[in-house]
Structure formats: C-alpha cells, structure tokens
Amino acid sequence: MLEQEKIIEHLDAVFRDMESRLNGRAGSLLHNFHKASFEALRSTHFPDRKHEDWRYTPVQRLISPKYKLAEKKQQYNISEIQELDAFKIPVINGHVILDGVDAALKSAGVIIRPLQEAMQISSPENNSTRWLHKVMNTSNQAFELLNFAFHPGGILIEIPKNLSLSKPIEIQIIHDDPDISFSHPIYFI
C-alpha cells in the first residue's frame, strides 16, 4: 500500500471517531464543512520534494505519525503562565474554553461566538461562513484541507467598529495532550 493511502486510511479512522463524538451535531454546517474538507483531502496528494515550495520540508515525517483527536479538558489551570495584562481567551488542546473568557471583555461589547454558532447566522456580514466556503471551494492544498477536516471548532470574535479596549486580547493556547493530536481551532476576528 502506498504511503499516501496508509495515511488517508488512518485519517479516515480518525474522522469516523470524530463523527462518533458529534452528539447531535451531525449534519450541522460545521460538520458538513468537516466532511467536505475530508472528501476533498482524499483526492488531494500531499506535496513531496518534487514540489518547489516543499523541497526542503520532510513532509512524510509531518504526516506519518498516528494523529488522534485532542481531548477536551473539563478542568484547566493556566495560572502557571506569566501574566500579561490582557483580556484572556483560553484555548486548551484546541478547544476554546468559553467559560474562561474574561467577563470584562464581554461587558465591553466584544461578542465571542463558537464557530458552530457563528456558522448558523445567515447574514452577508458573516465573514466566517463566507470565507470558509470560498477557501474550501478553491483549495487543493493537502495541509489546508487537513486542518479544515480536523479542526475541533473555533471562535468568531466580533469587535464593534470604533470600540477601544483598555488592554489587548490574549488568546492563551495551551497543548498538554501527551499524544500527537489535532488541536488547531480556527479564529475569526
């Protein structure tokens, strides 16, 4: 079996595992986006040394590990990270912890929505859905499709026009999963 086929076979098992965890979200816009991305990935080859942009990158070493889905932590502790005076949005193992978002950020007028919820909004101003569909329809890049197929979600951060915040927004990305896993959410700001 060719290396590419072995990798797709493994990713297929991971994708089925991801679908088994949807808990009522099967058929949602986000799930359909994952499926379309994975189907496109099946027919797209990963680059190799013959591709100029990837000549010096050991692509096989990047894609050959047995990736799994990142586990969502129920409890987290980020107090060990040196403090920056900022509004904080914690992301642990690729999952945005909405309960951990600084309440002052929300009260300042910033709207933070999970990507799943943001995709449900039908509006011409819905940049997340418009951008995702545009990129999905034009992408033939294997790594881009891989990220789209396996991202654990993401967030849309809406900052009203002319809003001035007293401090920056810090997205705290923490990965403590001991296994090699997919933990790359999509952010729209």
State where each predicted segment sits.
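Glycine-rich and polybasic anion-binding loops at the starts of cofactor/ligand-binding domains
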Residues: 1-189
